[in-house]
UniProtKB/Swiss-Prot annotation:
Family the entry assigns: Belongs to the class-I aminoacyl-tRNA synthetase family. MetG type 1 subfamily.
Pfam family, one: tRNA-synt_1g
Annotated binding of Zn(2+), by residue: 146, 149, 159, 162
Molecular function GO labels: ATP binding; metal ion binding; methionine-tRNA ligase activity; tRNA binding
Motif ('HIGH' region) on chain: 15-25
Location of the tRNA-binding domain: 574-675
Keywords on record: Aminoacyl-tRNA synthetase, ATP-binding, Cytoplasm, Ligase, Metal-binding, Nucleotide-binding, Protein biosynthesis, RNA-binding, tRNA-binding, Zinc
Name assigned to this protein: Methionine--tRNA ligase
The protein's enzyme class: ligase
Residue ranges of the motif 'KMSKS' region: 331-335
GO cellular component: cytosol
Residues that coordinate or bind ATP: 334
Co-factor(s): Zn(2+)
Organism, as annotated: Pseudoalteromonas atlantica (strain T6c / ATCC BAA-1087)
Amino acid sequence: MSSQPRKILVTSALPYANGSIHLGHLLEHIQTDIWTRFQRMCGHEIYSVCADDAHGTPVMLKAQELGITPEEMVARTREEHHQDLLDFFVEYDNYHVTHSDENKELSELIYNRLNDAGYISKRTISQLFDPEKNMFLPDRFVKGTCPSCGAEDQNGDSCDNCGATYDPTEMKNPRSVVSGATPILKDSEHFFFDLPQFSDMLQNWLKSDALQSEISNKLEEWFEKGLQQWDISRDAPYFGFEIPGAPNKFFYVWVDAPVGYMASFKNLCDRSGINFDEYWGADSDAELYHFIGKDITYFHCLFWPAMLEGAGFRKPTGVNVHGFVTVNGAKMSKSKGTFIKGRTYLEHLNPEYLRYYFASKLGANVTDIDLNFEDFAQKVNSDLVGKVVNIASRCASFITKRFDGKLSDNVLEPALVAEFQHAQASIAQAFEERQYHKAIREIMALADKANQFIDANAPWVTIKDESKQAFTHDVCSLGINLFRLLMVYLKPVVPKLAEQAEAFLNDDLSWSSAQSVLTGHEINKFKALMQRVDMDKVNAMVDDSKENLAPTVTLDPNSPLAKDPISDTIEFDDFAKIDLRIAKIVVAEHVEKADKLLRLELDLGGETRQVFAGIKSAYQPEDLVGKLTVMVANLAPRKMRFGMSEGMVLAAGPGGKDLWIMEPHEGAQPGMKVK
């Protein structure tokens, strides 16, 4: 790691202005803030900027829904986002918004330079159009049936069921999410950026140290398919910046969103006298880093550097990509209460719990981070409270009560102090490389050694022996110094705790101060620095995050529920009469002269039943043997011309090939009752 002062500009991806900050956002902002604070502690000149991403159809429609202008909604949301981040101790030098004069000026400048250089072209394309709302529909505002697998209610550009990607015009039974109307095809002239012209430059850039290897490898797929021209325009009505010289044509949000990094920094420069070109000019020797999530990689690693190159600006030094946040091993869920907004978290828990936990799991790769609440409580309570803060609380009272609040002039074990100080280099390297989990692991190993030292010397015992007062003073003073070193290393992660420690220690914690020891130094009276995580508060947070999603669901007229509505309500006693059991299919065979039936022999775990099931159109008999399914076991036997049917297997679907028998999860056994 360089010891020379560096000039660095850091950005985080811009939160979109139509929703609240949640834990997924916070992973990235905390990751960025830790790195920024570390660099600043090391004495480097670093600026961090962010902004709200304000443009696009979703913002326009949300504002209409609220009965306010998009500008009003964006201003309100930006204030909310910024305050949430501040309350998690995420401090940007500037937090701006993309609907700004600076962003309009820079977006037009970049576009005009690209256009003058011949990188912009126009052509007519056909798009889905909502005839009721009189607007073209972005991909996310079209739903329909997947053209690949036939799954219904899929997004306009990709299928959650089979993973296929496609053009919205390829969907079957498309409908507008805005009005529910069936969209029509309509022609419109669009503007395109000639991305293929930058193919060689981008491939060379991908091979540099700017990206993690897994990201570079993934992006190679784009070159294997061949880069395509990028549609950079959208038609009115649209909330955004109008393209110069093109009435009712607007920049696509992903054109001006990354320009928002430049605009936020320019806003800071104009207020603070910083030289903008020293950081964004083509010959800049400053470092520029973007922290982003893996879902927006291709915008930042293909389109954005090509735009910068074509417009005569510098490219990023590095794009640091992280994974998603899962909660308790699963995708965040509003119904389960694990889609947790930042403000809801703050109403229940200390923000530094989350900062520390994320740091303990964050590396420089793109792996998803799981927030397991039991592990979260155990790690924070064990590490921060039980190890680090405990060192100070075990030693401080003796210093205050017996030694007038002054540390000893003597350093009892210089070798132990030297070990703590020597670790600074490897901890710094881990922070520099964004291997926060390695830094935390090493810091906690040192905390263990500090506690072992205190345990071995037991000041609570020696304080009772008048002949060992000086020794006790030395032990507790060294304990306080070890705590101080740990807090220097943890300061980028838990800045508020470090601030409280500074007040207690009566000392400023800088990265360089780790090479000194406090002797004969007066400290202040110790106050509790951090409370343990209370699982009752965690559970209350989850409960407060649960949402009843039923009111937000709109019925798709082509959905199974619309075609086959729910039957009349029955009493529980009626349902309780049905005996559902797990059954194993041991025999499956065709029934001669039957068009729809298969004959099944079902093992109920001690009893075998014969059932004729109308699933021949969907299954080959050999594919069913060995499967577990669910059957109605107490249905009266029914005599058929092929034999006696002694029950019924359960299946879902409209019929034909679209039938699926019920299959229980692994662990179910034949004969088990389904309740």
